[in-house]
Amino acid sequence: MPAAIRRPPRSLYCGQVRPAHIGQTVTLYGWIDRRRDHGGVIFLDLRDRSGIVQLVADPQKTPLSYELAGQVRSEYVVRVTGTVHQRPSDSFNPRLATGEVEVYAEELEILSRVGKQLPFSVSGEEGEEVREEIRLRYRYLDLRRERLSRNLQLRHQVIKAIRRFLEDEEGFIEVETPILTRSTPEGARDYLVPSRVNPGEWFALPQSPQLFKQLLMVAGVDRYYQIARCFRDEDLRADRQPEFTQLDMEMSFMDQEAILELNERLLCHIFKTVKGIDLPRPFPRLTYAEAMARYGSDKPDTRFGLELVDVSPLFQGSGFKVFAKALQEGGVIKVLPVPGGDEKISNTRIKPGGDLFKLVTQYGAGGLAFIRVRPGSLDTIGALKESLSPEQEQQLLQLTNAKPGDLLLFGAGPAAVVNESLGRLRLHLGQELGLIPENALNLLWITDFPLFEFNAEENRLEALHHPFTAPHPDDLADLKTARAQAYDLVWNGVEVGGGSLRIYQREIQEQVFQTIGLTPEQARDKFGFLLEAFEYGTPPHGGIAYGLDRLVMLLAGEDSIRDVIAFPKTQQARCLLTGAPSGVEAKQLKELHVASTYQPG
């Protein structure tokens, strides 16, 4: 057999070459980013994950490599050995970390060629816009590009910072929980896996490690974390994937204050380590009720104002029928004051058929009433104008802090509908009017969520977070209206994490199961192992989980989590690279005792 080829080891990554290496001989490996022929001297940009360095092939100084340099093309894989030189001062490139140096290619070896036309340019300087479908189909090429390569490295840095903080400073241990488990109702549909050795029975892929991490607390692990893979079979949006990654944590003998304080220090450590940003502590807090009242959302973007104002008392017994009807039916009247909106927003946009009308009706509102604040008067439709006395007009201006030139937009109806529609309108106008400062960074906690919400389709209560969340101790007398000891972390209007103190007493857990409609038999069948564990000495405990993909997305300044995941699925839950999901052979289905009833077309 021929002897194995021995190549010199890499001495540096391309992006690490600096003026300190001038005069040294280095060996580099990477991809050709660009090739330029300038009057007989060939310049090559060599790229790896660390960056780009310029190579020089000169027929006078490096004759052995010059001929090969003429053959290389973009994305050829090469090895180069050569001496580091300082670039002429007039050819410094301030855009590159290596822009003051170049490597004279004394040896050049082509390791791999490109055998067909590239589907798109990998070079970052081409400025080529590539459809996402093409990028996902050739993801291995897309990941060579500077932006995605940087995002993957940022993701690694975030995970490394998490591990160092939790393990080295806080005494957490990383424990892997099962991927093949049993199906339990947690909201979204499970991905099911048939068991070949137990015909007719199924595993489910975990939507979260929730139950196992609670059992780890029963087991005395005390402080657990995991970079956990989770799976949910749900309709996808820009910020959702069928498989995703969580930073999952659980802690014994810690109350809510201690958990929030520890997590603030964790977030501060991450931001300082990967972005060099010092976050102020403590983070602001809003209760769920405050967030809904002021922003119409349980994940408010607090970088700008435009807060909602409840003016329901002002319109009690109003002669304006729309408002009177809403209040008689137990609803609310709220105002979204828009400073300077009188000139910026036309009546056409507010009335039926207008874009703002369509926006609020999309979320259940019947429409928008409005008042334009003019010097010395309020301008609106006759019926609303006539329903307001001069004293009420003044009270309205005081409540909303409105000035001449402002626009008041009204929502009337059930509180949930008014909050949702005006909250969405607030975000839309905040962006449209340029009220959101780009570089602002607002993190806050939302606390005191309701324990349950009503599911109108199924005519029953269901857990707002999950049925293992502990009720507030002051609300145990009536669980149906209880507050939850739950908390969400919101960053610029995006929920990046959420958690709670957990139920650790069997009798309370059984009451919660009963409240969401599980019979004792159903509770034992689905969660008997958890209920039994609570009989053997369970510590008070709580935890939190962060959407790691979403956290990295925000740190990277991206708009979609697909741009911070190496091999994401499309919004149709497909992998365009491998063709998954795909059909399987009849033999495989037979072994699993499974038959497909799907009929194409």
UniProtKB/Swiss-Prot annotation:
<keyword id="KW-0963">Cytoplasm</keyword>
<keyword id="KW-0547">Nucleotide-binding</keyword>
<feature type="region of interest" description="Aspartate">
    <location>
        <begin position="210"/>
        <end position="213"/>
    </location>
</feature>
<dbReference type="GO" id="GO:0005524">
    <property type="term" value="F:ATP binding"/>
</dbReference>
<dbReference type="InterPro" id="IPR004115">
    <property type="entry name" value="GAD-like_sf"/>
</dbReference>
<comment type="subunit">
    <text>Homodimer.</text>
</comment>
<dbReference type="InterPro" id="IPR004365">
    <property type="entry name" value="NA-bd_OB_tRNA"/>
</dbReference>
<dbReference type="InterPro" id="IPR004364">
    <property type="entry name" value="Aa-tRNA-synt_II"/>
</dbReference>
<dbReference type="InterPro" id="IPR047090">
    <property type="entry name" value="AspRS_core"/>
</dbReference>
<dbReference type="InterPro" id="IPR047089">
    <property type="entry name" value="Asp-tRNA-ligase_1_N"/>
</dbReference>
<dbReference type="GO" id="GO:0004815">
    <property type="term" value="F:aspartate-tRNA ligase activity"/>
</dbReference>
<dbReference type="Pfam" id="PF01336">
    <property type="entry name" value="tRNA_anti-codon"/>
</dbReference>
<feature type="binding site">
    <location>
        <position position="186"/>
    </location>
    <ligand>
        <name>L-aspartate</name>
    </ligand>
</feature>
<dbReference type="GO" id="GO:0005737">
    <property type="term" value="C:cytoplasm"/>
</dbReference>
<dbReference type="GO" id="GO:0003676">
    <property type="term" value="F:nucleic acid binding"/>
</dbReference>
<comment type="function">
    <text>Aspartyl-tRNA synthetase with relaxed tRNA specificity since it is able to aspartylate not only its cognate tRNA(Asp) but also tRNA(Asn). Reaction proceeds in two steps: L-aspartate is first activated by ATP to form Asp-AMP and then transferred to the acceptor end of tRNA(Asp/Asn).</text>
</comment>
<dbReference type="InterPro" id="IPR012340">
    <property type="entry name" value="NA-bd_OB-fold"/>
</dbReference>
<feature type="binding site">
    <location>
        <begin position="232"/>
        <end position="234"/>
    </location>
    <ligand>
        <name>ATP</name>
    </ligand>
</feature>
<feature type="site" description="Important for tRNA non-discrimination">
    <location>
        <position position="38"/>
    </location>
</feature>
<feature type="binding site">
    <location>
        <position position="502"/>
    </location>
    <ligand>
        <name>L-aspartate</name>
    </ligand>
</feature>
<feature type="binding site">
    <location>
        <position position="232"/>
    </location>
    <ligand>
        <name>L-aspartate</name>
    </ligand>
</feature>
<keyword id="KW-0030">Aminoacyl-tRNA synthetase</keyword>
<keyword id="KW-0067">ATP-binding</keyword>
<dbReference type="Pfam" id="PF02938">
    <property type="entry name" value="GAD"/>
</dbReference>
<feature type="binding site">
    <location>
        <position position="495"/>
    </location>
    <ligand>
        <name>ATP</name>
    </ligand>
</feature>
<dbReference type="InterPro" id="IPR004524">
    <property type="entry name" value="Asp-tRNA-ligase_1"/>
</dbReference>
<dbReference type="InterPro" id="IPR045864">
    <property type="entry name" value="aa-tRNA-synth_II/BPL/LPL"/>
</dbReference>
<dbReference type="InterPro" id="IPR006195">
    <property type="entry name" value="aa-tRNA-synth_II"/>
</dbReference>
<keyword id="KW-0648">Protein biosynthesis</keyword>
<dbReference type="GO" id="GO:0006422">
    <property type="term" value="P:aspartyl-tRNA aminoacylation"/>
</dbReference>
<dbReference type="GO" id="GO:0050560">
    <property type="term" value="F:aspartate-tRNA(Asn) ligase activity"/>
</dbReference>
<feature type="binding site">
    <location>
        <position position="241"/>
    </location>
    <ligand>
        <name>ATP</name>
    </ligand>
</feature>
<protein>
    <recommendedName>
        <fullName>Aspartate--tRNA(Asp/Asn) ligase</fullName>
        <ecNumber>6.1.1.23</ecNumber>
    </recommendedName>
</protein>
<keyword id="KW-0436">Ligase</keyword>
<comment type="similarity">
    <text>Belongs to the class-II aminoacyl-tRNA synthetase family. Type 1 subfamily.</text>
</comment>
<dbReference type="InterPro" id="IPR002312">
    <property type="entry name" value="Asp/Asn-tRNA-synth_IIb"/>
</dbReference>
<feature type="binding site">
    <location>
        <begin position="547"/>
        <end position="550"/>
    </location>
    <ligand>
        <name>ATP</name>
    </ligand>
</feature>
<dbReference type="InterPro" id="IPR029351">
    <property type="entry name" value="GAD_dom"/>
</dbReference>
<dbReference type="Pfam" id="PF00152">
    <property type="entry name" value="tRNA-synt_2"/>
</dbReference>
<feature type="binding site">
    <location>
        <position position="465"/>
    </location>
    <ligand>
        <name>L-aspartate</name>
    </ligand>
</feature>
